[in-house]
C-alpha cells in the first residue's frame, strides 16, 4: 500500500478505491428510477476489458456507545442539564428503533495490469477522474481513499470483534522492518472447517450467488443490504472484449445450429416431424440470437460477475440464522446462495476491497443484467456535528435524521403543514433542541400565544404587545449597523414604506408620489439622531406624523391622517420608545391580542426588531434563529412582501437562520417575488398538505407522486424533509412521557391529561 492510495496487489496488478455515497432510488418515481438505471448502465459500459473492478457494500456493527457519543448533548453545569440529559435519552431511545447500530459504506475498487508502479499511476489517475465524473453525473458524492484510509478500512474489516483504534504511521515502517500488513492483521484467522471461518472472536461464512432467474429485480441487492446484521456484499465485475464476446456467441449459435440439424436428421430417419426438436435446444438458440442482437445493436457489453456474500456473527448459531436469512432473500428472487466449501479463505480475501478475485465462479451477464444490482437505495442524513438537530426518523430505513442547517448554502427554512399535522410541535421541538445544543439567540414571532410556556421554561422573555400592554416596541428603532451600506437609512426607509403601506395603502398599495414623500420625511426625522445617536433622540411614529403634517402636498396630509389613529388614536401601541429589554437569549413576541387591524403591523414591527438584533449579534459573531409563525400574513401586501423577501435574503449573510411556519402555501407562492422565499430556503420541513397545496408544492419543488404520498393524509409528525438536494420521508414519534413533550404539546387531550394528573397529585398530597 502506498500513501496516495495505490495498492500493489500482485507483482503486476495495481488498484485504487473510491468511496461513494447513497442517493434516493427506491423513493423515486419510475421515470427517475429509469434515468438512474440508464446512467448506471452507461457507468458500467465505461469499463473495458483492461480494467477490473469490484463493488463492495460493507455493513459492520458499531457499538451503541459509538453512536451514543455522537448524539449526546454535553452538559454545561446549568439548570438545564436535566433537560439535556432527558433529550439525550430521547435520542438514544429513537436510535434504538432504527438500525443505526450498523455503519453502512459503499466502495468501488478498480485495478489495472502494469509492469511497474510508474506505469500504473497515470492510467489509474485517468480512470479515477473518469469514475468521479461518472458518479457526479448520477448526482452521487464520491471521493478517492488515500493509503491511510484504505488501511483503516481493511483494519476495521479484520477487527470486527474489537473496536480498537487503528494506529499507524508511514514513518514507522522503515525503523520497525514491518509491512503495512502487520498493522492491519487480526489477532487470529481460522479456516479449519471448510464451511466457515474465524477472524478474531467472530465467526463468518462466505457464500456465492447462483443467478438462476431468467429476470432479475432491482430490489434484490437492497434487500441484502437491509439485513440488520454484519454483512459484506462483494461484486467482482470484468468486462469481456466486445469483439471476442460477439465471436464466442456466434460460435455458440453455430454449434446450436449444428445440433439442430443433427436432431432434424434423426427425426427424418425415425419417421417423425423434423420440426419437433428438444425444447431446450430451441430455447438456447432463441436466447443466443437475442443476446447477439443486444451486443450488436443495443449498447450492451458482456461482463463476467462473481457475487459474494459474507455473513459475520458472534457465534455459530447466530451465523446460521444470518446465512439462512440471506439465503431466503436469494430464493425470493429465484436465485440460490451457496456456501463456498473449502474456499472460505479465498472467498474472504476476495471480499476485501482490494479488487482481487480468487474465486473462479463467474456468471456471464449483459450490461443491463449487471446494472439491475443498483447500488443505491435511500439516502441517509446523520450529521454528527455539535450543532446537528434531531428531525425524526428516516421513514424508509428507520434511522435517525440529524442535520445542521448552518452547513447548508442557505440555512433559511420553512415548516409547512395543515392544522393538526404537528407544525407547531415541530417548531417548538426544534427551538428546544437549538437552545440545548447551541449558543444561538432565539427570537419568536408568536401571533397565537402558543410559545409562552416553552419560552418561560427556558427562562426566556415573553414580550406581550397589545393595546392594553405596557410593553412597547418602537418601529422607528434604528441600529447604526442596520445595513451593509454606509447609510443605514436605505433599508430602514424600505421598512417604514412597508409599514405605511399596511396602514395607508389599501388594495393598490402606495402611489409613487406617496412613497417619495414618506422617504423624504424619514430622512428628515432621523437627521438629528444620526448626528447625535443617543437613545433619547430616537424618533417615534409621532415624529414622522408631525413631519408629514409639515409637508405641502395633499398626499402628505392624506398619509398623516391615515397615521393619526396609530399616533394619537386608540391604536397608538406603536407610538412609544422601546421599553422592553430584549437581550435575553430567548425572546417571544406575543401579539395575539393586537387584533386583526394591528396584527400584520405587529408582525412587521417584530421583524424589524429582530433585524436590529441580528445586526448587533453579527458584530459579536453570534447566530440568531428567528421563528415566524403564521408567516403568510406578511406576504399579502406587495410592499410588505417585498421587504420580507429582502430581509429573508439578507439573513444568511448576517448570521441569521429564519424559519417561516405556515399552513397557507398559496400565499407563499402568490407572486414571483414571494417565490424567492422558496428559492432562498434550502430547508423545508413539510408535514401533511391539503390537496390544492400538494399540487402547488409538487410543481415548485419537483416532487414525484410517490414522494407526495408521504404528505397525503399523513399522520401527525410524518412528512418530507428537504435538506439541500436531499429529499427524505420522516416520522417523528416524540416520546410522550418526557417533561419536554408536556411543555411543548398543544393538543387539548394531552393538556387535559396533564391537568388531571396535577389534580390527582394535589388530592394525594
Predicted regions and their residues:
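Extended, folded cores of ATP/NTP-driven motor/assembly subunits in large transport
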Residues: 1-378
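Hydrophobic positions on the alpha1 helix immediately C-terminal to the Walker A/P-loop
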Residues: 426
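Conserved P-loop NTPase
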Residues: 701-756
Amino acid at each position: 500500500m502506498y500513501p496516495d492510495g495505490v495498492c500493489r496487489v500482485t507483482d503486476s496488478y495495481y488498484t485504487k478505491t473510491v468511496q461513494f455515497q447513497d442517493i434516493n432510488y427506491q423513493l423515486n418515481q419510475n421515470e427517475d428510477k429509469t434515468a438512474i438505471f440508464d446512467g448506471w448502465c452507461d457507468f458500467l459500459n465505461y469499463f473495458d476489458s483492461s480494467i477490473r473492478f469490484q463493488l463492495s457494500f460493507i455493513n459492520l456493527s458499531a457499538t451503541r456507545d459509538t453512536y451514543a457519543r455522537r448524539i449526546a448533548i454535553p452538559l454545561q453545569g446549568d439548570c438545564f442539564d436535566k433537560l439535556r440529559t432527558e433529550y439525550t435519552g430521547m435520542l438514544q431511545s429513537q436510535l434504538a428503533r432504527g438500525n443505526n447500530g450498523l455503519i453502512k459504506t459503499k466502495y468501488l475498487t478498480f485495478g489495472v495490469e502494469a509492469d511497474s508502479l510508474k506505469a500504473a499511476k497515470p492510467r489509474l489517475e485517468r480512470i479515477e477522474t473518469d469514475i468521479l465524473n461518472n458518479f457526479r453525473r448520477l448526482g452521487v458524492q464520491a471521493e478517492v481513499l488515500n493509503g491511510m484510509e484504505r488501511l483503516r478500512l481493511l483494519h476495521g474489516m479484520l477487527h470486527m470483534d474489537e473496536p480498537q483504534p487503528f494506529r499507524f504511521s508511514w514513518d514507522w515502517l522503515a525503523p520497525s522492518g514491518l509491512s503495512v500488513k502487520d498493522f492491519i492483521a487480526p489477532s487470529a484467522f481460522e479456516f479449519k472447517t471448510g464451511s466457515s471461518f474465524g477472524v478474531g472472536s467472530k465467526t463468518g461464512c462466505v457464500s456465492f450467488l447462483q443467478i438462476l432467474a431468467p429476470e432479475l429485480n432491482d430490489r434484490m441487492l437492497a434487500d441484502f443490504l437491509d439485513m440488520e446484521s454484519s454483512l459484506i456484499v462483494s461484486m467482482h465485475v470484468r468486462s469481456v472484449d466486445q469483439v471476442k464476446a460477439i465471436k464466442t456467441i456466434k460460435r455458440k449459435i453455430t454449434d446450436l445450429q449444428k445440433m439442430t440439424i443433427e436432431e432434424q436428421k434423426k427425426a427424418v430417419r425415425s419417421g417423425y416431424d423434423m420440426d419437433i426438436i428438444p425444447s431446450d435446444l430451441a430455447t438456447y438458440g432463441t436466447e443466443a440470437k437475442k443476446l447477439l442482437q443486444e451486443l450488436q445493436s443495443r449498447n450492451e457489453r458482456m461482463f463476467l460477475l462473481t457475487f459474494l456474500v459474507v455473513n459475520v456473527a458472534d457465534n455459530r448459531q447466530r451465523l446460521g440464522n444470518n446465512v439462512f436469512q440471506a439465503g431466503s432473500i436469494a430464493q425470493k428472487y429465484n436465485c440460490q446462495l451457496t456456501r463456498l466449501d473449502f474456499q472460505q479463505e479465498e472467498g474472504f480475501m476476495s471480499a476485501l476491497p482490494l479488487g482481487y478475485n480468487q474465486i473462479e465462479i463467474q456468471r456471464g451477464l449483459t450490461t443491463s443484467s449487471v446494472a439491475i444490482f443498483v447500488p443505491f437505495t435511500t439516502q441517509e442524513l446523520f450529521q454528527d456535528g455539535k450543532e446537528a438537530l434531531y428531525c425524526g426518523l428516516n421513514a424508509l430505513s428507520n434511522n435517525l435524521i440529524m442535520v445542521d442547517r448552518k452547513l447548508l448554502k442557505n440555512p433559511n427554512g420553512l415548516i409547512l403543514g395543515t392544522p393538526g399535522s404537528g407544525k407547531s410541535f415541530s417548531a417548538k421541538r426544534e427551538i428546544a433542541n437549538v437552545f440545548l445544543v447551541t449558543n444561538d439567540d432565539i427570537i419568536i414571532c408568536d401571533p397565537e400565544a402558543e410559545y409562552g410556556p416553552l419560552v418561560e421554561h427556558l427562562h426566556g422573555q415573553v414580550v406581550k404587545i397589545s393595546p392594553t400592554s405596557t410593553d412597547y416596541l418602537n418601529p422607528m428603532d434604528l441600529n447604526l449597523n442596520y445595513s451593509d451600506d454606509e447609510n443605514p437609512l436605505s433599508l430602514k426607509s424600505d421598512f417604514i414604506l412597508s409599514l405605511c403601506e399596511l396602514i395607508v395603502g389599501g388594495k393598490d398599495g402606495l402611489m409613487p408620489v406617496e412613497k417619495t414623500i414618506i422617504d423624504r420625511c424619514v430622512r428628515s426625522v432621523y437627521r438629528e439622531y444620526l448626528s447625535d445617536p443617543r437613545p433619547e433622540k430616537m424618533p417615534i411614529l409621532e415624529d414622522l406624523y408631525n413631519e408629514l403634517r409639515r409637508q405641502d402636498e395633499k398626499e402628505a396630509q392624506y398619509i398623516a391622517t391615515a397615521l393619526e389613529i396609530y399616533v394619537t388614536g386608540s391604536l397608538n401601541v406603536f407610538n412609544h420608545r422601546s421599553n422592553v429589554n430584549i437581550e435575553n437569549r430567548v425572546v417571544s413576541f406575543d401579539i395575539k391580542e393586537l387584533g386583526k387591524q394591528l396584527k400584520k403591523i405587529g408582525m412587521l414591527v417584530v421583524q424589524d426588531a429582530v433585524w436590529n438584533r441580528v445586526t448587533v449579534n453579527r458584530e459579536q459573531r453570534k447566530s440568531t434563529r428567528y421563528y415566524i409563525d403564521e408567516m403568510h400574513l406578511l406576504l399579502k401586501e406587495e410592499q410588505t412582501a417585498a421587504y420580507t423577501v429582502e430581509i429573508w435574503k439578507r439573513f444568511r449573510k448576517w448570521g441569521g437562520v429564519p424559519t417561516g411556519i405556515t399552513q397557507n402555501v398559496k400565499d407563499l407562492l402568490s407572486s414571483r417575488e414571494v417565490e424567492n422565499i422558496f428559492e432562498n430556503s434550502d430547508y423545508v420541513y413539510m408535514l401533511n398538505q391539503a390537496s390544492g397545496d400538494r399540487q402547488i408544492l409538487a410543481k415548485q419543488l419537483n416532487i414525484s407522486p410517490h414522494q407526495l404520498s408521504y404528505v397525503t393524509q399523513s399522520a401527525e409528525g410524518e412528512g418530507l424533509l428537504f435538506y439541500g438536494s436531499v429529499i427524505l420521508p420522516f416520522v417523528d414519534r416524540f416520546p410522550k412521557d418526557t417533561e419536554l413533550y408536556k411543555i411543548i404539546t398543544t393538543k387539548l387531550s394531552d393538556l387535559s391529561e396533564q391537568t388531571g394528573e396535577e389534580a390527582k397529585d394535589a388530592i394525594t398530597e
